[in-house]
Amino acid sequence: MGALNYLSEYFSNHFYVSIRKRKKRKVMQTVNIKVKIDCDGCERKIKNAVSSIKGAKSVEVNRKMHKVTVSGYVDPKKVLKTVQSTGKKKAELWPYVPYTMVAYPYAAGAYDKRAPPGFVRKSEQAQAQPGSTDDKLMSLFSDENPNACTVM
């Protein structure tokens, strides 16, 4: 009987340990959400709803920038869903980055007139196409080009 008890205990403990290892632990992060906040009531409603989320450590509401910042062990999708459940259906994750983080802030995809001061929209930087017209223009005025003087 001792061997059977040992084996059953071994396999049952191994099963529970593997379940515990599969469960992901949430990481500490800051979630920024853009949501239109009109009045004190809206601000209070959003703050109460978001602070009730399990794992939320701090909640800051900036009415001027239409921004809600949540710090803690939270899931961004869950925070967004909670803000939308308060009646703010147009809530979205913060689409802006600081002006200094973008190489070309006035590019067509990055510049946004509605962005708060000091911020531009998140966008991928445009990559140069191989064989683009820039290369052709550079070789047009090159010293190695025998027909360059005809253009000038």
Curated annotation (Swiss-Prot):
Tissue-specific expression: Expressed in lateral roots and mature anthers.
GO CC annotation: membrane
Ligand binding (a metal cation): 39, 42
Chief place where the protein resides: membrane
Domain HMA intervals: 28-91
S-farnesyl cysteine lipid sites: 149
TM region(s), chain numbering: none
UniProt xrefs under Pfam families: HMA
Residue numbers covered by the propeptide annotation in the UniProt entry: 150-152
Compartment(s) where it occurs, according to its Swiss-Prot or TrEMBL record: Membrane
Disruption phenotype: No visible phenotype. Hipp20, hipp21 and hipp22 triple mutants are cadmium sensitive.
Residues found modified as Cysteine methyl ester: 149
GO molecular function, one term: metal ion binding
InterPro entries in the record: HMA_dom, HMA_dom_sf
Biased composition (Polar residues): 142-152
GO biological process entries: detoxification of cadmium ion
Swiss-Prot/TrEMBL keywords: Cadmium, Lipoprotein, Membrane, Metal-binding, Methylation, Prenylation
Region (Disordered): 123-152
Family to which this protein belongs: Belongs to the HIPP family.
Subunit structure, interactors included: Interacts with ZHD11/HB29.
Biological function: Heavy-metal-binding protein. Binds cadmium. May be involved in cadmium transport and play a role in cadmium detoxification.
Protein name: Heavy metal-associated isoprenylated plant protein 22
Organism: Arabidopsis thaliana
Lineage: Eukaryota, Viridiplantae, Streptophyta, Embryophyta, Tracheophyta
